[in-house]
Regions:
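The beta1-alpha1 cofactor-binding region of Rossmann-like NAD(H)/NADP(H)-dependent oxidoreductases
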Residues: 90-91, 110-125
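Conserved glycine-rich Rossmann-like NAD(P)H-binding loop of the short-chain dehydrogenase/reductase
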Residues: 79-95
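Conserved mid-core segment of classical short-chain dehydrogenase/reductases
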Residues: 121, 143-154
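Glycine-rich phosphate-binding loop signature in dinucleotide/nucleotide-binding domains
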Residues: 127-132
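Canonical Rossmann dinucleotide-binding motif of NAD(H)/NADP(H)-dependent dehydrogenases/reductases
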Residues: 49-83
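Rossmann-fold scaffold of SDR-type NAD(P)-dependent oxidoreductases
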Residues: 60, 111-112, 134-142
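Non-catalytic terminal and boundary segments that flank Rossmann-like NAD(P)-dependent oxidoreductase
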Residues: 1-53
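A short helix-to-beta-strand connector/capping loop
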Residues: 100-107
Length: 154
């Protein structure tokens, strides 16, 4: 489907950031708040329409990247959300709280390492308690490892 604005076709190749991204080094897990330019996760652009009113979601990896975009979209669509993130990413989670304060949805922040089974159990338990149940799981948490050639990706 073409990118339309006022029923006029707009070539999408000119719509987004095109400059070379400067090399940036951070120790994992890294913070989105330290990236330049900042990734567009919908902070300014996404407008909700109430499509998820009354829903309750747990979003893993919701402090940055795609997970942050999902958290913003779900909250602006009316869902109450619980966001899991690594404790080292607290600054990104705090900025998400600041962004979504006053938007009308409940936001529960749940730090924890998903590689630990007990942490997983606690996160789910705390999300269910905080939101009075769950309707949706967005299992987005992951790590990024840059490789120069796709053949080296596993």
């Amino acid at each position: 489907m073409p990118n339309n604005r006022n029923n006029i076709f707009v070539d999408p190749r000119g719509e987004y950031y095109h400059d070379a991204y400067p090399a940036q080094q951070q120790e994992p897990p890294g913070l989105e708040s330290r990236m330049q330019p900042r990734p567009d996760t919908g902070e300014e652009s996404y407008r909700g329409h109430g499509r998820l009113l009354g829903r309750k979601a747990l979003i893993t990896g919701g402090d940055s990247g795609i997970g942050r975009a999902v958290a913003i979209a779900f909250a602006r669509e009316g869902a109450d959300i619980a966001v899991n993130y690594l404790p080292a990413e607290q600054p990104d989670a705090a900025s998400l709280r600041t962004l979504l304060d006053g938007e009308g949805s409940r936001l529960t922040l749940l730090p924890g390492d998903l590689s630990d089974e007990q942490s997983c159990r606690r996160i789910v338990r705390d999300a269910v308690r905080a939101l009075d149940g769950l309707d949706t799981l967005v299992l987005n948490a992951g790590t990024q490892h840059a490789v120069k050639e796709i053949a080296h990706l596993s």
